[in-house]
């Protein structure tokens, strides 16, 4: 009944009804923002919108209007730079923070047999304090003068330009924190996200006001599951079960769409963010892109598709391109995110439904457990029927504009296996076929990890980039097939990845946001900004693999690699360098 009522309410948003990107004009919807960003005062559009105001919003906007009046609405770049210096403070709103639960030698290190990998894991554990931040008291006193949304607990930032908490990054960061026994820090990060959920009605892309209107893949339930599996903290589940249900309701209320396939109607989720104007943190880039469109095209159409792609986390990729011929060729002007039904979003949501059902059962709420369990079963069924491709032997995104599956390799194709959104009989029947698909694609044969796609478009979420979260998804998906062959393959891919990351870390002393599948350990390229180091989810994924497979992975290939853990530090490091 609920799904029927939701379907009745599905309508197309009229441009005049579009909400602004956020309710803070200075940072989201003002002539001030437009003038400053289009003047290109800073090479990265995110720089300006991360500045704090020295005065309140009204005083800042009034002063800018006076500048426009004085200059006949034609201020010079120097005028704008002077205004920004006078009215904005580029000092960070965050301060460094040392988590009390950080341990120099967490117990999991003892599970890692290979000495080179054990030392690598320890080095990654040592990075956590360098990425730990908390909101400054001055920001808490005047939160309205910053684009940062204050949060109660300290947290781990991804790194580089990403100086705030990010929704889907947090999943792999929290996983890494739990592996290294930083349970209180992980708990605080989850509670920060729940604070954002209650403040906005959903968890935004990140803890900035300019992310207000969009979310990211709904991984809150999966994060809480990780925390519960580590701590068995049933009171935490009891306290926040309503938050899980609130998030599920948000996605059902705002992202649901009905579509036809083979004369049947299916109801699944898509990414769709209809709000006015460019993304503030990429204002210049979005505005310039809109100028390339046909003059009869409403720029808010492309802005919505840009924001929707950003909500997916895959900003940007041919995955969201629909050309005039209906394929995934073209460029950003071909973005059509709203007309793609994503495999991974629906797999994650099916997983969230089932996790919530399981938690309600643990809490002895059988009616709520049955409600969410039934929806999870229906979601898995829709994924199987609408997104499984019998010919290819894998799941594909679905193009609702042209009513056809998008038969291209993307790592997201494996998300149902990752999120256990596959019924056991179906898995038993088709698991081997998925492995065949992967081998036929040749996507597993690169020295630097599994690339996110096989299309070299120049976009950062395409070939040759290998992204840590997607490598995690692929390896875990293959492991979850449950066969001897799949288990062996998962370990092999994990070893390739950890070796590649270790190679890059040895050379550069840094972990990167993304890597080059063609060159083991080299950072990836493309996109709207320069390479970012740190890096939260990259550290988390390596720790995940070493925690899961540390007893068997080796950092070098040699006849006596099995005895590597018995070598001295000096001998082990010499071997690693020689290789």
Curated annotation (Swiss-Prot):
Glycans are attached at residues 29, 58, 205, 331. Its EC number is 3.2.1.28. Substrate binds at residues 161, 168-169, 205, 214-216, 279-281, 313, 528. Its main location: membrane. The active site is at 315 (proton donor/acceptor), 513 (proton donor/acceptor). In midgut and Malpighian tubules. One of its GO terms (molecular function) is alpha,alpha-trehalase activity. Residues 560-569 have a biased composition (Polar residues). It is found in: Basolateral cell membrane. Pfam families: Trehalase. It catalyses: alpha,alpha-trehalose + H2O = alpha-D-glucose + beta-D-glucose. GO terms for cellular component: basolateral plasma membrane. It comes from the Eukaryota. Belongs to the glycosyl hydrolase 37 family. Involved in uptake of hemolymph trehalose into epithelial cells in the midgut of feeding larvae. This is Trehalase. The lineage of its organism: Eukaryota, Metazoa, Ecdysozoa, Arthropoda, Hexapoda.
